[in-house]
């Protein structure tokens, strides 16, 4: 029974990361639209779709109770901060995909686990073991040396990594179930998204006359929610270190799409930075597996 649940966990989690990795192909279908327009529609339609999901899961009451609880314990600010951070992350990713920065976007999600560890040290007083300390140092050195030697700072990668890392940090303060969390986050930011579309006059997207653009924008909400729901189902069946290993599926797919589908240049500065990050991730993953085995032996 346990083996069957673990197998399900691997499948759900792997599929969620594959979907995230393939996202660039989807955003490219909407590249005629400004990134802010795509973001606004993504927020709105994600909220609409998640409301439908909560209705069928019969979790409306739970969602309302969670919102009231957040109001009482002061968690609304953390929820709003999380919604701002995930919106920044979505915007930067969409912009990066449609402006030829796919390789940097993939680098951002390779860096993310290391950034999350760094944020844990700074804000949660977590401690690193020696291997993790070396891993974070190698990654930081790679970015810094690349900046000085090649004059190339991976702004997109750093924005994606830190916005998502800070998003994860803010979510630790709310501890909401994933479906309810996404619903409330999009609910919090939706007035801004609606206001932007109304005041910019971009409610009607370019090419919407055929209906194809509207369909793609609506499905952006569906495809935002689906991998998240699959990930939630998978992650609860797997130990954290296995999820940590599987998460590299998404940036690897994105990297391959950038290189072989859209033929983005792989410069010497990118090669150096990626090499440092991959070396750091190998050490980091090894330290997680080693820690897991040590904890089992005790």
Curated annotation (Swiss-Prot):
The cross-references to Pfam families, in alphabetical order and at most eight, read:
EamA (PF00892)
Membrane-crossing ranges are: 10-30, 36-56, 76-96, 101-121, 142-162, 179-199, 212-232, 243-263, 271-291
Cell location: Cell membrane
Q: Where is the EamA domain?
A: 17-148, 162-286
Keyword Cytoplasm set for record = no
- Single GO cellular component term: plasma membrane
Annotated InterPro entries: EamA_dom, RarD
Q: Which superkingdom?
A: Bacteria
Query: How is it placed in the membrane, per its record?
Result: Multi-pass membrane protein
SUPFAM superfamilies the UniProt entry points to: Multidrug resistance efflux transporter EmrE
Sorted alphabetically, the keyword list is: Cell membrane, Membrane, Repeat, Transmembrane, Transmembrane helix, Transport
For this chain, the family text in UniProt reads:
Belongs to the EamA transporter family.
Q: What is the name of this protein?
A: Uncharacterized transporter YojE
Q: Which organism is it from?
A: Bacillus subtilis (strain 168)
């Amino acid at each position: 029974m346990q083996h069957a649940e673990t197998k399900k966990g691997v499948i759900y989690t792997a599929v969620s990361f594959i979907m995230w990795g393939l996202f660039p192909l989807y955003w490219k279908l909407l590249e005629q639209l400004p990134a802010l327009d795509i973001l606004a529609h993504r927020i709105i339609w994600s909220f609409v779709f998640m409301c439908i999901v909560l209705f069928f899961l019969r979790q409306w009451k739970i969602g309302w109770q969670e919102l009231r609880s957040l109001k009482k314990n002061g968690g609304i600010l953390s929820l709003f901060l999380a919604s701002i951070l995930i919106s920044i992350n979505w915007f930067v990713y969409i912009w990066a995909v449609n402006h030829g920065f796919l390789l940097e976007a993939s680098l951002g999600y390779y860096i993310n686990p290391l950034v999350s560890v760094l944020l844990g040290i700074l804000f949660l007083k977590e401690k690193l073991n020696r291997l993790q300390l070396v891993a974070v140092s190698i990654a930081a050195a790679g970015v810094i040396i690349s900046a000085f030697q090649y004059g190339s700072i991976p702004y997109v990668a750093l924005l994606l990594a830190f916005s998502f890392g800070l998003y994860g940090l803010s979510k630790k303060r709310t501890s909401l179930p994933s479906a309810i969390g996404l619903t409330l986050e999009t609910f919090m930011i939706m007035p801004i998204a609606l206001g932007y579309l109304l005041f910019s006059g971009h409610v009607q997207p370019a090419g919407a006359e055929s209906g194809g653009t509207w369909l793609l924008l609506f499905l952006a909400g569906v495809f935002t929610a689906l991998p998240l729901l699959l990930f939630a189902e998978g992650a609860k069946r797997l130990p954290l270190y296995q999820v940590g290993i599987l998460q590299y599926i998404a940036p690897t797919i994105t990297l391959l799409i950038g290189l072989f589908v859209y033929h983005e240049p792989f410069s010497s500065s990118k090669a150096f930075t990626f090499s440092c990050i991959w070396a750091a991730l190998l050490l980091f993953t090894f330290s997680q597996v080693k820690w897991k085995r040590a904890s089992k032996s005790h």
